[in-house]
Amino acid sequence: MSKYIIGIDQSTQGTKALLVDEGGHLIHRADRPHRQIVNEAGWVSHDPAEIAANVLAVARAVVEETGVDPADIAGIGISNQRETTVAWRRTTGEPLCDAVVWQCARARELCDELAAREGVAELVRDTTGLVLSPYYPAGKMAWILENVPAAAEAAAAGELCLGTIDAWVVWTLTGGAEFRCDWSNASRTQLFDLRRGCWSEPVCEAFGVDVACLPQVTDSDGLFGTTDLGGFLPAPVPVHGVLGDSHAALFAQGCHSRGMAKATYGTGSSVMMNVGDEFVASSHGLSSSLAWRMDGVTEYVLEGNVSYAGAVKTWLRDDLELINNPEEVTDLCYAANPASRVYFVPAFTGLGAPHWASDAEGCVFGMTRTTGRAEFVKAADESIAYQIFDVIDAMVEDSGAALSELRVDGGPTRDAYLMQFESDLVGSPIRIASNDEMSGLGAAWACGIALGMYTRDVVDVYGARGIVEPSMPADERAKKIAGWRHAVAATISYTA
């Protein structure tokens, strides 16, 4: 009798369920989008009840659409959008307001007030590894407690649950029997003490959040409860393998040891490096977080995010009309004058890690009379690689771990020029994933490993779509990096 794992990937835009077989292969996928609720102030919300309904619907659909016997489902794993925050009543499971999405900055004023208090920003950063920001759930939870009367009332009555999306999905799947989150998601709340591995009473007190309102933190491969998918399965199955989406992708990419890193290229880019089993504080403003806790071992990561990766190509197409589709970029880059020294710094919304210049604006440097369409497109494409190199370089300096290999996924990885240039900059091989469902697969595989269906070798089941080796001479590489750094410094100086 065959056995299957369902990997639920609850993301910003919707919910997927992946059906994974005993060999670790993806058999089928079912999807459902959910509404993006944006008000006039630009606040971004999701309906928790809609997400809960979609979780159950896609998990059932992925079984029904394949004709798999529901009795053959062995377990369920979860990957989720991080930082999005849900408040609900413990006694009824009723959401008390819409979920505050990770993108939403409605808690900015509250966080600014906290940062103005002596020692609070330092306490938060030193304890949680994260810069005090409305991006994280701590500020969102504090905002909910101050602005949603039903939440404050529930807290006073000891009935309030405040959790990240993984906690809400676990609650949904277990019919309210379990209120748990995993270590990776806990580490992104800005309330978790990374060194001690528990909720921080002093940080929670600073934000006005009662620890009693927070979920029980459970090992990422631990047992989060059981589910029959609302009566769909003939018997309850265990929920194991719960991870934030970037952490699940890191796991699926096989970055299980110190010095291994992954970059997901999308509209922006998430860059994450496994720094081993000891906490590493960043001197470059990178986020220090937990990769996961599995097999009783806690592993840490450094993380940096790039705002404009694939979005640069969208800008070239939609705003400048220099290309008709992103696939043209590779050919244009190879056709450009190799002697071109044009640099483009895409600081459309400032520069993030490791530069942290929020007021910076996009700039172009080094144009000559011979600069044409191809040279400009090449500079824009290279800017993606330079930004990711900056984050990787900061990670290597912070951690002292040499980069052994960069593992990548996402649509822009199909750009051969970009991948070669990235490999040349980081000075290491780049391994390109052959499957785009890394987050959901990471959760499913982690669940299967916990159940004894797989070993960690399952991450190699798909192999690589390609491996790119660095080939640029060292002196040329150094010259290009120096030129980029000069361009970034000039951009920051110009807009300061």
PLM feature segments, named:
Residues 68-71, 212, 401:
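Structured loop/turn residues at beta-strand edges in well-structured enzyme cores
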